[in-house]
């Protein structure tokens, strides 16, 4: 009897190992697909930026462009993580499967919140950021706005009020594995921006980026 019980435990253990391996593989494939989709969209976004930074209306809405039937307000670059990603204009679960999204706000009003899934190729490594790391948001006029990380916190997944609270110039967030909490990165503006008439900083960044180079 003990012999058969041992076989049962071994079988159950094997099932758990197989299920875990399947889940890891599934998540890896899903992350890779999300990365490829984002890369394709990034190319279309950067191609629609002007060759020189143009004037913008700080009191108006961020300009939006269409790429493959989706709307984008620009890009977000996190050099320390090797990320350069297109930002969709509106958050939706389906939108977040292919790129990060504006949750609310505007870079012009210093209250932009950007959300993304925890895919490795999206915002999965936000937890690895450090204070003073650089974050760059570029609008569709080619103008880049520079920020630095000032705080990293973990909030409950339903703590919407806390997510939107405070006078932060830029917030990035993603869910933890399992979705119970949100890794939340708060940033402040450094005051640095690209100048009108300059070649957009993001064009050079795109040329060097793995997200463009591998295409």
Regions found by a protein language model. Name each.
Residues 1-5:
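Short, Lys/Arg-rich N-terminal segment immediately upstream of the first membrane anchor
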Residues 6-215:
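Solvent-exposed, non-transmembrane regions of membrane-associated and secreted proteins
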């Amino acid at each position: 009897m003990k012999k058969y019980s041992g076989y049962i435990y071994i079988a159950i253990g094997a099932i758990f190992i197989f299920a875990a391996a399947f889940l890891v593989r599934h998540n890896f494939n899903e992350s890779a697909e999300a990365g490829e989709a984002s890369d394709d969209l990034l190319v279309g976004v950067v191609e629609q930026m002007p060759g020189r930074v143009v004037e913008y209306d700080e009191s108006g809405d961020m300009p939006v462009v269409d790429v493959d039937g989706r709307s984008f307000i620009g890009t977000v670059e996190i050099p320390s993580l090797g990320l350069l990603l297109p930002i969709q204009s509106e958050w939706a679960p389906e939108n977040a499967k292919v790129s990060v999204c504006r949750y609310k706000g505007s870079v012009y009003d210093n209250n932009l919140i950007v959300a993304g899934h925890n895919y490795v190729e999206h915002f999965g490594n936000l937890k690895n950021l450090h204070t003073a790391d650089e974050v760059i948001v570029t609008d569709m006029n080619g103008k880049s706005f520079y920020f630095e990380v000032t705080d990293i916190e973990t909030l409950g997944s339903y703590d919407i009020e806390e997510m939107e609270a405070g006078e932060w110039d830029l917030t990035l967030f993603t869910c933890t594995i399992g979705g119970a909490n949100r890794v939340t990165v708060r940033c402040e503006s450094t005051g640095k921006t690209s100048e009108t008439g300059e070649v957009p900083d993001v064009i050079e960044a795109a040329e060097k980026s793995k997200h463009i180079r591998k295409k």
